[in-house]
Regions:
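Non-catalytic architectural context of zinc metalloproteases
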Residues: 1-76
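Zinc-dependent metallohydrolase catalytic domains
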Residues: 76-80, 84-149, 161-476, 481-501, ...
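N-terminal phosphate-binding loop and flanking beta/alpha elements of the actin-like ATPase fold
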Residues: 152
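Walker B catalytic acidic pair
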Residues: 155
Length: 552
């Protein structure tokens, strides 16, 4: 956390200790938002949340001190209790809206380790092996990403979405990766909305949430550090959820912020593009809140939980096509019809429209588009009534897909049963740079299918165009390359593990990377899979700095 707040922090610690008296060891100091949140609630003494028990997703907290206590910011003991409390608060807020989170992704560690300070880096990460936070020594003093509840909740949000939709992990589409980042920011906001003192403070600033405030501003402390280290780049300003950004086709955007440009501008870098969806979600909360007419802290809690539940269902049920923001929005509308009898349809539609995304009614979003072979003459009751083999063969022919897996998932359309066929296309990255010659990257091509007759099926969603898939994947890989997020495989000796793969040394040297250095912990690596070299995700990063971290 910033050294500039040291004196005020010490005064608050002393007052908290005096009030706690004999019970001081049973409480901890906790920053409920970000250390640099302007007008946010101050650090306070709280009783630490208990460990999660039962059949739920759990953490394995690393480097635990002997006991709880009112430790000062900047100490290892404070960082442990702060990051622990923030992580538990994030899951608690999500579950209050969306119900119990029974486990992390089946590909992730159970329990999931949380590292309060994993070394020196201006960043934070979720890999399927851990959520990890770091420290960095800046001109104004040390900063700790684990000291920010915003940052911890964001990374926990990645883990939550990975539990809901593990298939997003392997996708090489910009909007899929950007939605992952947006979901993390949404969980950070849900965590803030779930805190009573925070709700009171934000409504004192903006009674209807229409004015800029600390809650919709994400990662102030890390953004400050990025600006000191990297100058004016993507990530050098806090991400604002109250924004006027409008959706644009990602492949038409610059891959990174041009020198001298304002970080508020939209680029195809995933953290930048994520702000379009966080803007939609914040506006959903705001619209539900104002439409219900109870502009109180209690009313805000209700509105945020309604929006959080819709977001969770939207993420679970969205069709993973390249336009994922729209797909999640349509799935949120469908969830609202089922959960709330459509009470929030206008709030959702208006929120997405405000950011350039037009949502169709769920009943109109899935209409017959193409006849396919694959009906079943005598279907079993309640089944989708499809011949998976026949439909798969037909779709492969139409997709021009001679290779790649074809996954079949159940898909519900109201009271009707359907199936979702998902082909994984491997896209060549030749021509993007020497580091990616001979490398391929995977992307999903989904089609929703239902039975039309005894001999035919019908596609209810557009049949993907392979050229569009290739264009989107190559653009995403290019943004990773430009932003220094691709690594090459090392030998196992000395390498750490992440996401089931060996960590790899950074090799991508984009224009800015050549000037400012590249993170030694990239989000993607090139791995060998049989005879193929495949672009593989190993982690989600906070996206804060391109400067390589030093050792502990």
């Amino acid at each position: 956390m910033p050294a500039t707040k040291g004196k005020a922090t010490k005064r608050r610690v002393k007052r908290a200790t005096k009030k706690s008296g004999a019970g001081a060891t049973k409480k901890i100091n906790f920053i409920p938002n970000d250390p640099r949140a302007v007008n946010g609630p101050p650090m306070r003494a709280v009783a630490p949340r208990p460990n999660r028990t039962g059949t739920v997703a759990k953490f394995a907290f690393q480097a635990a001190p002997a006991r709880a206590g009112l430790f000062e910011p900047g100490t290892p003991e404070f960082l442990y209790w702060q990051s622990r409390e923030a992580a538990l608060a994030a899951v608690e807020a999500f579950e209050a809206a969306a119900g119990p989170l029974r486990a992390w992704s089946s590909f992730a560690a159970q329990p999931l380790p949380l590292e309060p300070d994993a070394g020196r880096d201006l960043n934070a990460y979720y890999s399927r092996d851990s959520v990890s936070f770091f420290h960095s020594v800046l001109a104004g003093g040390p900063t700790f990403s684990g000291a920010s509840t915003d940052c911890v909740a964001h990374e926990v949000g990645h883990a939550i979405l990975d539990a809901l939709r593990p298939d997003f992990w392997t996708s090489s589409l910009t909007e899929h990766a950007a939605f992952h980042e947006a979901f993390g920011d949404c969980v950070a906001m849900l965590t803030a909305f779930n805190d009573a003192e925070t709700r009171t403070a934000v409504l004192a600033i903006s009674p209807n949430l229409s004015k800029a405030n600390f809650l919709e501003s994400i990662l102030e402390d890390l953004a400050h550090g990025v600006r000191l280290v990297d100058g004016v780049v993507d990530g050098s300003k806090p991400r604002r959820s109250l924004n006027k950004l409008r959706w644009q086709l990602p492949t038409t955007l610059p891959a990174e912020l041009a020198p001298g440009h304002n970080p508020d501008e939209l680029t195809g870098e995933v953290h930048s593009f994520a702000r379009v969806f966080t803007g939609c979600f914040y506006d959903v909360v705001r619209n539900i809140f104002t439409s219900r007419g109870t502009l109180t802290p209690a009313g805000l809690l209700t509105a945020s939980r309604i929006a959080g539940a819709l977001l969770a269902e939207g993420a679970r049920n969205a069709v993973e096509n390249p336009r994922l923001y729209e797909a999640v929005g349509v799935a949120m509308l469908a969830a609202d019809l089922g959960m709330n009898r459509g009470a929030n349809q206008l709030a959702i539609v208006a929120a997405f429209a405000n950011h350039g995304i037009a949502l169709a009614h769920p009943a109109r979003a899935f209409q017959p588009r193409a006849r396919l072979a694959g009906g079943v003459a005598k279907p079993k009751r309640g089944a989708a009534a499809l011949s998976a083999r026949a439909v798969s063969a037909e779709l492969r022919r139409r997709l021009g897909a001679t290779t790649g897996t074809m996954r079949v998932d159940d898909f519900t359309l109201g009271a009707d049963a359907a199936s979702k066929f998902v082909h994984e296309r491997s896209v060549s990255l030749d021509g993007l740079g020497a580091a990616l010659e001979g490398v391929v990257a995977p992307a999903p091509e989904p089609v929703v299918v239902s039975r039309a007759s005894a001999t035919a099926a019908v596609a209810l969603s557009p049949i993907p165009d392979s050229h569009t898939t290739e264009d989107e994947v190559r653009y995403f890989a290019m943004t990773l390359l430009r932003n220094g997020q691709i690594g090459e495989q090392q030998s196992p000796r000395g390498a750490a593990r992440a996401g089931g793969e060996m960590l790899l040394s950074a090799i991508s040297r984009g224009r800015r990377g050549a000037q400012g250095g590249t993170t030694a912990m990239p989000t993607h690596v090139v791995t060998s899979r049989g005879a193929e070299r495949v672009l593989t995700r190993v982690r989600f990063a906070c996206g804060c700095s391109r400067v390589a971290p030093r050792t502990k």
